[in-house]
Each structure stands twice: as structure tokens, then as C-alpha cells.
Amino acid sequence: MATTAYIMIEAGVGKVGDVASALRSVPGVTMVDVVIGPYDIIATVSAQDMNAVSEVLANRVHKIKGVTRTLTCISLQR
């Protein structure tokens, strides 16, 4: 069964659109919503396991220019 993670993302001033666009091209990212609240974007990642989710976060999401902070929540049951 795939592992699903919800990533709350804070983007730099004026970078929300660029970050959201970049996220949409990341393999494993299945949804990107721009939101209002303490975070600017919520993205959903679906991957084979926790290691694969970690790879997406470390090697793709955190390297997007304009990402300043993230909070990741792992789904336990759907």
C-alpha cells in the first residue's frame, strides 16, 4: 500500500505561485492547493513507502526556490 503525506509549505513573499507551479511537476506530488492560513500551500505526496516520501521531500520539495518552511503529516488510515 502506498504512503500518503500532506505537506504544509510556507513560501517566501511573492513566491507562492512559483512554488506551487514547481510542486505540480514533482513526481509523486498528486495535489497542490494554495491556501490561506499559517501555511501558503498544502501538497499531497503519494509514494511507495516512507523512504520514498522522504526522498521526495529532501531531494525535490526542500530544494524548490522559495520554500522557507514545511510541516509534514503522514496519513495513517484512509
Task: Locate predicted features.
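A compositional/biophysical signature of low hydrophobicity enriched in polar/charged and small residues
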Residues: M1-R78
